[in-house]
Amino acid sequence: MHPVLRQMRPQPRATTASAAVALSGSGEQEEPQCPTLELEEGEGIARLGAHSPERHPRVQLARDSRVAFVPRQNMFRDNSGEEAEEMRDCRFRAGRELRRGFNRERLLREEDFEPDEHSGISSARAHVSAANLVTAYEQTVTEERNFQKSFNNHVRTLIAREEVAIGLMHLWDFVEAYVHNPASKPLTAQLFLIVQHSRDNETFRDAMLNIAEPQGRWLLDLINILQSIVVQERSLSLADKVAAINYSMLSLGKFYARKIYKSPYVPIDKEVKIDSFYMRMALKVLTLSDDLGVYRNDRIHKAVSASRRRELSDKELMHSLQRALTGAGTEDESFFDMGADLRWQPSARALEAAGVASADVTGDDDDEDQYED
């Protein structure tokens, strides 16, 4: 504790001489007072009882809650627009080359921080810079690998659904018709209806609205490629379709990246970003196809639990048996159509919730008894 703060503390109450004589005359001995330590008294330079880091409560708390943390880095996507052109590509390739002969077990010592006579850079500084490049390279590879795995899982889940193939077929059919006849009012109405399903992505929505124009050509190519893989190639396995879609995304990304830079050499970070853009748009097309594929023109049947259907009477059972023996009915008759002529009666709980009078239910039961007779 600081000496000035120690003098400002109130002193403990001292025993007077008369009180000491009275205590000695009575034969009572004064018990020695143990110094009590108030740990909650003061902080900083006014703290008591913390003469070493091992006894300091805040130091111990910080040590117990300390967690090793390495900040996340991605050379391709962090600090967009703040670095020199092609610098990300150089750092990525440098980290990949340094990773091969990098000594991860090296322990820096005092003499390692002395600058070199020729280069003026200490070996410790060079080692730390190399470690930063290697760490950034490894974290970038890990994040890009996770992004690719996530894309593969999403694509595999979507193309496994039959609704996606049906919706993509109708979407491609509409796009081909609209490109050849953009002035058609019915097709324009369909276009605005389709755009309603893609309001969360402005880039995709604008490209869909301008798909008949040159600025929407890339989306038309993407839909054609996905349709040729998912709809046309029905014999391909699920893994082959995922691989074909990935190859198509890489081909499209490389083509447009070279078109942007007007050179066969494109920085790897820009090529990865363009590939990621096409991957996100491919997922958007497949998701839109899933939304459109659920709107079928098939007859929708509501499956009713067997416990909520009235059991067959003897007369109805014999009638159904006669129809089955004679082969009555059409060949397209489905399982649910077999019981279409039966009468379904809701449960008593459902009737009570709907507020139907008990007299109505009794009347229905009488009608059923007459039907059975």
UniProtKB/Swiss-Prot annotation:
Pfam families for the chain: Adeno_52K (PF03052)
Miscellaneous remark of the record: All late proteins expressed from the major late promoter are produced by alternative splicing and alternative polyadenylation of the same gene giving rise to non-overlapping ORFs. A leader sequence is present in the N-terminus of all these mRNAs and is recognized by the viral shutoff protein to provide expression although conventional translation via ribosome scanning from the cap has been shut off in the host cell.
Function: Involved in viral genome packaging through its interaction with packaging proteins 1 and 2. After proteolytic cleavage by adenovirus protease, L1 52/55k protein is removed from the capsid during viral maturation.
List of residues that carry Phosphoserine: 52, 334
Entry's localization field: Host nucleus
Coiled coil region boundaries: none
Region (Interaction with packaging protein 1): 1-150
Gene: L1
Induction info: Expressed in the early phase and late phase of the viral replicative cycle.
GO aspect biological process, one term: viral release from host cell
Subunit structure: Part of the genome packaging complex composed of packaging proteins 1, 2 and 3; this complex specifically binds to the packaging sequence on the left end of viral genomic DNA and performs packaging of the viral genome. Interacts with hexon-linking protein IIIa; this interaction is required to promote correct genome packaging.
Descriptive protein name: Packaging protein 3
GO cellular component: host cell nucleus
Post-translational changes noted in the entry: Cleaved at different sites by the viral protease during virion maturation.
InterPro entries linked: ADV_PKG3 (IPR037536), L1-like (IPR004292)
Species of the source: Human adenovirus A serotype 12
